[in-house]
Amino acid sequence: MELLAASRACIFFGLVTVLDAWGVQQVELSEGAWAMIDGRDVLTPTNTTTRVTKAWTFLETPPGCAGDISVKKVCVSHSLCEDNIIIGKHCNLLTGEHGIALAEFNVVNGSLRRTDDVYFVNGTVFPILAETRSVLQIHRATPSIAGVYTLHVSIDGMMKHSVVLLTVKKPPKQPQPQPRLRVKTPPPVTVPQVPVKTHTDFVVHGYHSRVYRDGESFELSVNLESHIVEPSFSAEIQWYYMNTSSSSCDLFRVFETCIFHPTAMACLHPEQHTCSFTSPIRATKILHRVYGNCSDHGNSWPSRCHSTLLGNRLYFIQPAQNRVDLLFKDTPASATGLYVFVLLYNGHPEAWTYTLLSTANHFMNVLTDVTRPRLGEHFYTDLGHKIITPHPSVATTEELGAWTRHYLAFLLVIICTCAALLVALVVWGCILYIRSNRKPYEVLNPFETVYTSVPSNDPSDEVLVFERLASDSDDSFDSDSDEELEYPPPPKPAPQLPPYQFVDGGDAPSGRSGFKVWFRDTPEASPVPLHKPTLQGPDYSRVASKLKSILK
């Protein structure tokens, strides 16, 4: 913008904006109106275009200067004339131009693609920077939004501008109908009826973000407007704080539903609790003002009614004179976070707003979400454990240990179960191994093997052969036949070797077993039997054979 000062006697001085092809728009709105203002930035990227940057800026019109601002055509030469904004000399323009939106785009396949954007909005003006169009959306216009809105577009370093001069005027009053005069009857008197509100209404207007420097002082205002119909009421003004300096979220959400239902389970234990503001119970209360019995119905009731100040206020935060806003003095970098204002009327939340205060390094996007947050998969069930945002002046975090105890108990149960299964598998394997090596028909003999004679395979040696008797009824053990048993002659005694004789398998004649046998040096004399067996004694070999065959 250029400031024009007349060297001769002139009646005005002007603020001139040098524009490119898009010119100046003059928009006039009535107070409370809604509007959509086009920025007229029709862009056609060329083949050489690589980067496009768009920005909205705002220059506020000082109070009392609305009538001294106009749009006129200023000619630099005979062939170059452009529209410019002229401000009269009676208007003291001391305000600065502020950025309210910024977006960066890249050109991909001949079209724009958004890469980064940031918006500084309040509840009335919503700047929009899109790939094809840029607009200003006005909700319920107020005199405070009047001023000059400039759209800056940079295409590979070449700047273009589009200016909107916005003025807000009060709606014209409706003319009162004149009563008709009649000769015979007196004219009726009509009294205009003023609509009376039957309910209490609170409105807040404030910016949702502010970037500050370390050590800066400023005021955080919510612009509270009140309309109260009850003769007496109670109210509470609460300020909450949530630290966002350590958050790595691309988008921070503020759930409006949880402001009105702070004790809901999904609000107390939300999903991604570090990236959202849900229940005020999870935040730190930095200011709490209670009004017990107030009967003032104007907008100044917070400062006129008696109140009690509670809460642990920070050393760099002071309550403003109107007892609603906050004054920040020598603000440190640790004060970065989300500050939420809540107004309770007769115990119920009626109005709320938020502002993100941050340094340039910790700035993030904040979005208001009117849905219910999702419940976290693992939320804290012990009522003694509270989730509280740490104090902004103390750079400490509160460790949450409930989940550690739960996971350790779960891990211990798994280890015990695995150990029990392992022991059971080992026992079962041993049982299978014993069963596989066991002989089902083996007869266990507790006695050692005893040889009664020297083993030999000489056919001349008699060998006791156990034969199973034929299954004949005549030969049965229980047979009643009187047949006499035939007793064969007794066997001849085997020749005895002389003492100290060594039998070697190598010198043994053919047909021998080949066993090596050692005898004692002094052979023991065989005991003399008590009864000398008779030569013709009975032979029980057949009976023994039958018994053995039966026992076998």
From Swiss-Prot:
<comment type="similarity">
    <text>Belongs to the alphaherpesvirinae glycoprotein E family.</text>
</comment>
<dbReference type="InterPro" id="IPR036179">
    <property type="entry name" value="Ig-like_dom_sf"/>
</dbReference>
<keyword id="KW-0946">Virion</keyword>
<dbReference type="InterPro" id="IPR003404">
    <property type="entry name" value="Herpes_glycopE_Fc"/>
</dbReference>
<keyword id="KW-1032">Host cell membrane</keyword>
<dbReference type="Pfam" id="PF02480">
    <property type="entry name" value="Herpes_gE"/>
</dbReference>
<feature type="glycosylation site" description="N-linked (GlcNAc...) asparagine; by host">
    <location>
        <position position="293"/>
    </location>
</feature>
<feature type="signal peptide">
    <location>
        <begin position="1"/>
        <end position="23"/>
    </location>
</feature>
<keyword id="KW-0812">Transmembrane</keyword>
<feature type="glycosylation site" description="N-linked (GlcNAc...) asparagine; by host">
    <location>
        <position position="109"/>
    </location>
</feature>
<dbReference type="GO" id="GO:0044156">
    <property type="term" value="C:host cell junction"/>
</dbReference>
<feature type="topological domain" description="Intravirion">
    <location>
        <begin position="428"/>
        <end position="552"/>
    </location>
</feature>
<feature type="compositionally biased region" description="Pro residues">
    <location>
        <begin position="487"/>
        <end position="498"/>
    </location>
</feature>
<feature type="short sequence motif" description="Internalization motif">
    <location>
        <begin position="451"/>
        <end position="454"/>
    </location>
</feature>
<feature type="disulfide bond">
    <location>
        <begin position="249"/>
        <end position="275"/>
    </location>
</feature>
<dbReference type="GO" id="GO:0019031">
    <property type="term" value="C:viral envelope"/>
</dbReference>
<dbReference type="GO" id="GO:0016020">
    <property type="term" value="C:membrane"/>
</dbReference>
<comment type="function">
    <text>In epithelial cells, the heterodimer gE/gI is required for the cell-to-cell spread of the virus, by sorting nascent virions to cell junctions. Once the virus reaches the cell junctions, virus particles can spread to adjacent cells extremely rapidly through interactions with cellular receptors that accumulate at these junctions. Implicated in basolateral spread in polarized cells. In neuronal cells, gE/gI is essential for the anterograde spread of the infection throughout the host nervous system.</text>
</comment>
<keyword id="KW-1043">Host membrane</keyword>
<feature type="region of interest" description="Disordered">
    <location>
        <begin position="473"/>
        <end position="515"/>
    </location>
</feature>
<keyword id="KW-1039">Host endosome</keyword>
<feature type="region of interest" description="Interaction with gI">
    <location>
        <begin position="65"/>
        <end position="91"/>
    </location>
</feature>
<keyword id="KW-1133">Transmembrane helix</keyword>
<feature type="glycosylation site" description="N-linked (GlcNAc...) asparagine; by host">
    <location>
        <position position="122"/>
    </location>
</feature>
<comment type="subunit">
    <text>Interacts with gI.</text>
</comment>
<protein>
    <recommendedName>
        <fullName>Envelope glycoprotein E</fullName>
    </recommendedName>
</protein>
<keyword id="KW-1040">Host Golgi apparatus</keyword>
<dbReference type="GO" id="GO:0055036">
    <property type="term" value="C:virion membrane"/>
</dbReference>
<dbReference type="GO" id="GO:0044178">
    <property type="term" value="C:host cell Golgi membrane"/>
</dbReference>
<keyword id="KW-0732">Signal</keyword>
<feature type="topological domain" description="Virion surface">
    <location>
        <begin position="24"/>
        <end position="410"/>
    </location>
</feature>
<keyword id="KW-0472">Membrane</keyword>
<keyword id="KW-0325">Glycoprotein</keyword>
<feature type="region of interest" description="Acidic">
    <location>
        <begin position="470"/>
        <end position="478"/>
    </location>
</feature>
<feature type="glycosylation site" description="N-linked (GlcNAc...) asparagine; by host">
    <location>
        <position position="47"/>
    </location>
</feature>
<feature type="compositionally biased region" description="Acidic residues">
    <location>
        <begin position="473"/>
        <end position="486"/>
    </location>
</feature>
<keyword id="KW-0261">Viral envelope protein</keyword>
<feature type="disulfide bond">
    <location>
        <begin position="294"/>
        <end position="305"/>
    </location>
</feature>
<keyword id="KW-1015">Disulfide bond</keyword>
<feature type="glycosylation site" description="N-linked (GlcNAc...) asparagine; by host">
    <location>
        <position position="243"/>
    </location>
</feature>
<feature type="transmembrane region" description="Helical">
    <location>
        <begin position="411"/>
        <end position="427"/>
    </location>
</feature>
<dbReference type="InterPro" id="IPR013783">
    <property type="entry name" value="Ig-like_fold"/>
</dbReference>
